[in-house]
Amino acid sequence: KTYDVTTASHPVGESVLARTSMSYLGRFTDPETGTVVKSDFLAQFHCSETFAFPDSVKDHKITKSEIKLYIDKFIGDSLTSFKLSVYPLNKVMDPEVDYYTNIEPSKYYDTNQKPIAVKWFTLSDRTIDDETRWDLDYYNSINISLPVSIGQAIYEGYINNPDAFTNTDKWANSGIPGSKGFYFKLEAGDR
């Protein structure tokens, strides 16, 4: 049987409200239309009122700084390679402002600065064994190593000024590296 189908496109505006705790990262090219949909994101981190560094920090030295971006769902080939660059934000994002999907990231970071981290990754992490991957406690993530100096500066900020860690507003305005957040920019890869 043959069926006639009619479709129509309707504009919804330049952007939509982006107030969410979910972030989207990637690039997808529609094979039918050639339309490219790309998504990067800005992230500002919450500091809980009960935050405390663990007593396990030995000799006041941080040995590793890492951000994990947890993956809930994805489309496309899980073995496609992507390149992600991470830039520190130089401006606090106002929690009272509604941000839209047409936000200009360049207003929040130094475009002349090199990224503080670059990560090539696939959505299916091939660096772990199958036993770990299929464990019920495993959460798929993109693990991004940051300069240890950022972790050390955050730790020293906590030791020297614990009040900066008592709530998100104080943390974001503390001037401590990483406190304003990061821009996660997709540089290469297509679903």
Model segments located where?
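Secreted, disulfide-rich extracellular signaling modules
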Residues: K1-R191
